[in-house]
Structure formats: structure tokens, C-alpha cells
Amino acid sequence: MNTLKSLLGAHLPKHAIILGSALGSVVDAVQDATDIPYAELSGFPIPKISGHAGKLVLGKIGGVEVAVLAGRAHAYESGNAAVMRPALEQLKDAGIEILILTNAAGSLKASMRPGSLMLLTDHINCAGMNPLIGQHGDENFVSMTNAYNADLRKAFLAAAKKEKIAVKQGVYCWYSGPSFETPAEIKMIQIIGGTAVGMSTAPETILARRLGLQVAAISTITNLAAGIKGASPSHEETKREGMKAAGDMKRLLTRFFKDIK
């Protein structure tokens, strides 16, 4: 098994991207790409669900060196909220400073339709677990203030404006899954301030902040949440709508990296 650092070669990325469900085609934006299957990387978890390729892609987006993780493992696959910890630790060890997370999410607002993009301003942990449980040391008492970096969010909003992509902002609620949320659960998280709901991202953000990485996160809205008129969430809908939104995600990421180059 290899470590990511040992395989970088001439690549020296400071930015990493984790792609959510059905967003695998975003790797088409990577120029001079080198693919490394997760199976060849020590500690990288192999995703067990469709819509997650399970490979690392090294190259450039918008002229900036990036490491793109095409797919993630979820807490519901093993019961381990820290399932992405080994991968994030290797990213940190390889020199990554900024982590951009993407995900598929259900909208808690009827006006935010499937196909929309939403920048995360914050999250609410509704999963009853935390990826830092069981780790020792005072450094695990991580501040989650500005967990989703405000400066990175401004840069993404500027990029979206240039590309004429309508991007919302909101609070992401993490449920463990794999079952979708009940209408009663959706009503509850609407009341407490949620904007979208999904099964990933929050534990990765907690781990990334523990490692000292700056984080930005973008949801692709793939369905209306349970209980909202017209909603009938399914994994097939998630994959279908995720693929539709991938084009806007590619344009947004490309413009973001061109602007920071």
C-alpha cells in the first residue's frame, strides 16, 4: 500500500475536493489527470454504494493543482463517523491546506428546487455521533465557529456571479442515513433553522477542522425533503439530479480556481 504523499510526484496541491453522490463527472474538469484507485492508497475507505467511484484524481482545475476524491465512504456504511479520517490525515500530510466538500442534499424549502447549488454557512449535527469521539487530547475540543470559511464562501459567491450560476446559502443538517428522514424529522429541522439535509459532510468538516484545514462546502440539491409537497426521496433521484447539477458544479469550481490562481 502507498501513502498519498509518496505518490504525488510533481504534483503539489494545496486544495482537495471531495465529490458527493453522482458528481463523479466533475473530474472531467481536471486537466493532466492522474488517477489512483483508493484500493492502492493505505487507509482510504472504499465506497460501497453506487454514485461514488472510489478514486483519487491529481491534476489541475483552472490552472491550480488539486487532489480530487471521486467518492466518499459514509458513516452509515460501517457505523464509523470517522470513516474518512485516514484519507483526511493523508491529505493533510501531503500538504493540503483547503478542503472543498460537495454533497447531494435534500431541500427543506419548496423554493429551493432540485438542481440548485447551496453554499454551507454552518451545519447542525442530527446524527447522534461525532468523528472525534474516542480520540484523546485537548486538541479534540475543536471550535466550530467559522467552520465553513467565510472568505472561501465569498470567493465562491463571486465565482458564481461571474458564471451566472444561482447559488443559495444555508445550514446543512446531518442525519446518519441510510434511510431518508421522516416528515416529522424534516419539520423539526425546519423549525431549528435547517436549509438542507444530507448524510455526509459534517463529520468530514469536524475532522478537517481538527486537522487545521480550511473548509468550504457546496450541496447539490437533488430532491425535496420528505413531507414537502411533491417529495418522494430515493437514491435513484439523488443520482439522477446530481448528474444534472454536475455541469454547474464544474463551471463553479473552474471559475473559483481561475480566480484564485
Language model: regions and residue ranges:
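Active-site/ligand-binding-proximal alpha/beta "capping" segment
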Residues: 153, 158-195, 260
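Short acidic/polar active-site loop segments enriched in Thr and Asp
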Residues: 97-98, 195, 214
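His/Asp/Glu-rich mid-to-C-terminal helical/loop segments that flank catalytic regions of hydrolases
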Residues: 226-261
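Metabolite-binding pocket within alpha/beta catalytic cores that recognizes anionic/polar moieties
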Residues: 1-144
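Non-catalytic positions within long, well-ordered alpha-helices that form the structural scaffold/packing
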Residues: 92-95, 190, 209
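Generic non-transmembrane alpha-helical segments
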Residues: 3, 7-10, 151, 155-165, ...
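Zn-dependent metallopeptidase/amidohydrolase metal-coordination segment
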Residues: 199-237
